[in-house]
Structures are given as C-alpha cells and as structure tokens.
C-alpha cells in the first residue's frame, strides 16, 4: 500500500514538472494608453486631496488667536510638496500625450482614437482646474492673512500711519508678521534689514519667474514638436489622397474605354448575325424557286 502511494506521488510530480507556463501577453497599445490615463487620474485625485488638506490646515491656523511659527513651516512644506507634485503631474500628462500619439499610429479605428482623444482633453482640463484651485486656495489664504495683520497693526500701533502699515506689509511680508517673526512696532530699527530682505525677495522672485519661463518654453517646444508631426501626417495624407484621385481617374478612363470597346463588339456581332440570317433567307428563297420550277417541268 505504501509503495503504491509513493508511485502515485511520483507520477503526479512528473506531470506537474511537464507543465509549462505560457509567457505573459504584452499589453496592447490601447491597454497601455488606458493605464497611463488611469495613472494620471489617480495622481490628479491625490494632489486634489492634498490641496483640500492644505485648505483645512490654513483655516485652522487662521482660527488661532496666536499662530505658532511651526505651523508656518508645516504649511510651507505642504505648499512645496503640492508644487513639486503638480510639476510631476504636468510631466505625466505630457507622457500621456506622447503615448496617445503612439497609440494613434498603431490603431486604425477612428472611434477609439476619438474616445481616447476626449479622455486626454478631459485630463488636461482637470489638470488646469487643479492648478487654478491651488492658486485660488493660496491667494485666498494670503489675502485673509493680510487683512488680519493689517487689523492687528491698526490696533497695536497707534502712532503708525497708513503709509507705515503699507511699508511694513510690503517689506516684511504679511505672513511673517502673522507668525510673529517680525516686530511691527520696531519700524525705524529694522529699516536696513527690511531693505536687504526686500532685495533678496526680488532676486527670489526673479529666479522663480525665470524657472516659470523655462517651463513655459519647454511646453511650447513640446507642443511645436507635436504639431509638426501632425502637419507632416496631414501632408502625407493629402499626397496619398492626390495619388488615389489620380489612380481613380485613370481607372475611370480605362473603364470607359472598356465599355466603348464592348459596345463595338456587340454591334459587330449583331451585324454578323443579321448578315448570316439574310444569307440564309436568300438561300431558302432560291431553293424554293428552283424546286418549284423543277416540279413544273416534271409535270
């Protein structure tokens, strides 16, 4: 009994050894571009969640009587993370556009191309809405902080004029005043420091503008390359269409010639048949006359 069990187990093992797993099927062009679109959708949803969390945290900070400077670092880290992820999301959308162009080259179905073109446009529209949401959230927060700081300066600094308040707001920054990083009442003692800080802020703004311009130029370059390829495809399609029209015109002329030739052949055949029929009739008449004369002579 034990030997039979061992023999059965060995047979089962041998059968499993003979089984070979078939290689995984590579994804099709449609599956690949759909996966890329799904990746972009998930990334947009994730960044939108981070923006909503940033808005809640900003509202929490604005509700505090005295803001903690550590909250500022937390908010700045969140804003920096959102900006980095937004930049990564733009690159991901450009990759999705490239994948869609490859998809259009491999797929002939107009319906599938149009469907995925609409999906791509929707993703780009959602990205623009996401960027606008982030900018509106940040601008709303800065505006509310500025209003609160101006109210605090007007309450605390009885000897400050509107010009002093505006200068403090512009040079020091409303967020710095909000988080107690600058003393609003020491205006004259920090004039030099504020001037240096203002110049430093101008340099940082210039660097940010240069980086933004570089990104804009990269986007324009990408769009130009994509449009150049589209124009080339249109030119090729026009040339192919012209060749097909010429070929069709030649085929039509050939068909007309064939039709004329067939008509001439039919006329010739009909004339021959009529001639043969006339000859047969004449022969029959002659035979009838000859036979009738022969009968008369016999009588």
Swiss-Prot record:
Residues 112-146 form a coiled coil. InterPro entries: SNARE (IPR010989), Syntaxin (IPR045242), Syntaxin/epimorphin_CS (IPR006012), Syntaxin_N (IPR006011), T_SNARE_dom (IPR000727). It is a single-pass type IV membrane protein. Gene3D superfamilies: 1.20.5.110, 1.20.58.70. PROSITE patterns: SYNTAXIN, T_SNARE. This is Putative syntaxin-2. Keywords: Coiled coil, Membrane, Neurotransmitter transport, Transmembrane, Transmembrane helix, Transport. Belongs to the syntaxin family. Residues 193-255 form the t-SNARE coiled-coil homology domain. Potentially involved in docking of synaptic vesicles at presynaptic active zones. Its main location: membrane. PANTHER family: SYNTAXIN, SYNTAXIN-2-RELATED. It is found in: Membrane. GO terms for biological process: exocytosis; intracellular protein transport; short-term memory; synaptic vesicle docking; vesicle docking; vesicle fusion. GO terms for cellular component: endomembrane system; plasma membrane; presynapse; SNARE complex. GO terms for molecular function: SNAP receptor activity; SNARE binding. Residues 1-270 are cytoplasmic. It comes from the Eukaryota. The chain crosses the membrane at residues 271-291. SMART domains: SynN (SM00503), t_SNARE (SM00397). Residues 292-299 are extracellular.
């Amino acid at each position: 009994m034990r030997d039979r069990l061992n023999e059965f187990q060995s047979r089962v093992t041998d059968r499993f050894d003979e089984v070979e797993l078939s290689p995984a099927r590579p994804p099709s062009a449609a599956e690949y571009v759909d996966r890329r679109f799904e990746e972009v959708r998930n990334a947009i949803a994730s960044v939108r969640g981070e923006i909503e969390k940033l808005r809640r945290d900003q509202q929490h900070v604005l509700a505090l009587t005295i803001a903690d400077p550590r909250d500022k670092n937390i908010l700045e880290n969140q804003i920096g993370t959102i900006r980095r992820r937004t930049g990564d999301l733009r690159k991901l959308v450009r990759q999705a556009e490239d994948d869609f162009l490859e998809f259009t080259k491999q797929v002939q179905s107009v319906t599938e191309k149009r469907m995925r073109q609409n999906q791509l446009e929707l993703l780009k529209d959602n990205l623009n809405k996401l960027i606008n949401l982030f900018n509106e959230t940040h601008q709303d927060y800065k505006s509310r902080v500025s209003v609160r700081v101006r109210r605090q300066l007007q309450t605390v600094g009885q000897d400050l004029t509107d010009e002093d308040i505006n200068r403090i707001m512009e040079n020091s920054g409303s967020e710095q005043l909000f988080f107690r990083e600058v003393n609003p009442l020491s205006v004259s003692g920090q004039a030099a420091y504020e001037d240096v800080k203002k110049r430093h802020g101008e340099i940082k703004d210039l660097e940010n503008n240069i980086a933004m311009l570089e990104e804009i130029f990269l986007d324009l370059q990408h769009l130009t390359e994509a449009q150049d390829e589209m124009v080339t495809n249109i030119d090729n399609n026009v040339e192919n269409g012209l060749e097909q029209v010429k070929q069709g015109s030649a085929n039509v002329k050939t068909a007309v010639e064939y039709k004329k030739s067939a008509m001439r052949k039919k006329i010739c055949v009909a004339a021959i048949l009529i001639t043969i029929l006339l000859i047969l009739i004449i022969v029959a008449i002659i035979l009838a006359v000859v036979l009738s004369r022969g009968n008369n002579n016999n009588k």
